[in-house]
């Protein structure tokens, strides 16, 4: 067991918490207490299903004291102080930590954020990484300050973002690569030498909770990006035909069907009996739409809504 005293903050229903908690235990972290998030109102873009144990079960097995609450909840900060942590580690917690909380441990508070800060600060970073077509992602361990994911960076890991990724597959690739970071963090905690590099605030981008309107296909984006957006939340993306919103069940990026680009944006065309739209790179073929909760041929639906569709 290592010497430095660590308090872990996390959420029992989040894989981010359970997977990384397993790494901390495996690498002999001296965990003296756990603050667990209340689960009411917690949102996620992952599907769950981790084989790692939730933090409440780990706490019970290892006889680690655990409390559940928000940072300003009655007695929460007093209990964290009573554990006398050298450092606090956050691995999945949606509640803002006030300055009084950040100052409890002499070495401060570090947070595990699943994006390459300062890009994609805030919520659901994996979702937005895929949404914006980033080619690379990873884990960032940073010190927490009064801003939102704006504190000094300690470590980063890097993985590629692949076509066809979902939030689950991207996070799985990142998190499987995180044990070396945790071992390095624990080693540096022991020697009081956790590195601190200021973020470039000019590169800061903030995420928000996805809105229904975000899922309408924007044909100003390249076709493969639209396919990836569809895959990140299947059956949520949609097109509008004659004022009616149709969820997309299947779509494909296809090579240019013609040498001409004399076509209108946001306009459906008929290509060999398929419904297609021009994008800045390739064309998007919409194969199936959802009607009455069932996938149906997109071109037939478009014909019914629009009548004759121009052929390319």
Language-model features, listed with the residues they occupy:
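One-carbon transfer enzymes
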Residues: 1-235, 271-273, 281-285, 290-312
């Amino acid at each position: 067991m290592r010497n430095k005293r660590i308090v872990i903050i996390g959420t029992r229903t989040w894989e981010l918490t359970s997977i990384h908690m397993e790494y901390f235990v495996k690498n002999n972290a001296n965990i003296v207490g756990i603050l667990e998030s209340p689960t009411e109102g917690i949102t996620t873009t992952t599907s769950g299903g981790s084989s790692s144990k939730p933090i409440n079960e780990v706490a019970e097995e290892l006889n680690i004291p655990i409390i559940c609450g928000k940072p300003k909840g009655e007695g929460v900060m007093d209990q964290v102080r009573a554990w006398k942590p050298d450092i606090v580690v956050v691995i999945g917690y949606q509640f803002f930590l006030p300055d009084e909380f950040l100052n409890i441990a002499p070495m401060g508070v570090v947070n595990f954020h699943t994006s390459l800060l300062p890009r994609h600060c805030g919520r659901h970073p994996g979702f937005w990484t895929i949404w914006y077509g980033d080619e690379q992602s990873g884990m960032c361990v940073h010190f927490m300050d009064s801003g939102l994911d704006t504190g000094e960076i300690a470590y980063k890991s890097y993985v590629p973002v692949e076509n066809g990724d979902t939030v689950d597959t991207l996070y799985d690739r990142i998190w499987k690569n995180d044990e070396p970071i945790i071992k390095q963090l624990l080693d540096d905690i022991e020697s009081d030498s956790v590195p601190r590099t200021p973020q470039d605030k000019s590169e800061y981008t903030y995420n928000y909770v996805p809105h229904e309107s975000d899922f309408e296909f924007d044909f100003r984006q390249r076709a493969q990006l639209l396919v990836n957006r569809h895959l990140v939340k299947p059956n949520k993306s949609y097109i509008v035909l004659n004022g009616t919103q149709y969820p997309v069940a299947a779509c494909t990026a296809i090579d240019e069907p013609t040498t001409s680009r004399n076509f209108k944006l946001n306009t459906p065309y008929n290509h060999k009996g398929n419904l297609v739209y021009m994008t800045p790179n390739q064309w998007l073929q919409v194969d199936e739409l959802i009607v009455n909760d069932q996938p149906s041929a997109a071109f037939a639906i478009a014909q019914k809504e629009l009548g004759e569709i121009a052929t390319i």
